[in-house]
Amino acid sequence: MKRLLSSFFIFLLAISTLPARTYIVSVGIADYPGRQNDLRVSANDAKTISGIFTKNGNATVDCFVNSDVTIKKVCTAMRNTFAKASPSDAVILYFSGHGVPGGLVCYDGFLYYSSVLSIMRQSKAQQKMIFVDACFAGKMRNTNKRNTNYSKENVMFFLSSRSTEKSLETPRQTGFKNSLFTVFLERGLRGGADTNKDRVITAKEIYNFVHQGVVEASGNRQHPVMWGKFDGNMPVIKW
């Protein structure tokens, strides 16, 4: 009887420590209207990140690329997907494409971070994350708009570059199918960033891994930045 009670207790403990569900909207644009603004791998970046969380098996993933990445579709996807989250869950927006000060360049115009955060605030999830792989991504803090002190938001921002830097696409000859930031983000989320080998990648671990890899691979030309109001030990993924 004691053995049965002990086994039952262990079973309940295991249930209580199961990872919370992650709700992610992953979008990328390589093919912008016209030809001058096209990128090479941004659409694949979004597919790569969505694939990681889909394979994880504990995530609800929305992924769309190129002409599907309109302001309306992105906002609708975030509202519908993030609304499903409970307080113990996490919500994530991943974007790869062009950036502007204070926002993202969708297929049909600019989606400002203020709009993204407005939607995120409506979610019950306690863990909220934004990953952006775009040139001058860090410039989002340097807008002229009022009331844009995003560092006070309960959101982790992980941005591919400083405000004055370009986010590099990997050269064709390297064989990589992702931009430099997402190359290391993928490696980190698949276990490379798990320094203490506990099968959980935290915000601090993914930052350290990606930052070091990108800075070294770019020859000190690109420096990912992470900021916001969050716990550095916040789990990003259980792999």
Each predicted region: which residue ranges?
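Cysteine endopeptidase catalytic domains of the caspase/legumain-like
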Residues: 2-7, 16-239
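Repetitive helical segments and hydrophobic/amphipathic motifs
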Residues: 11-12
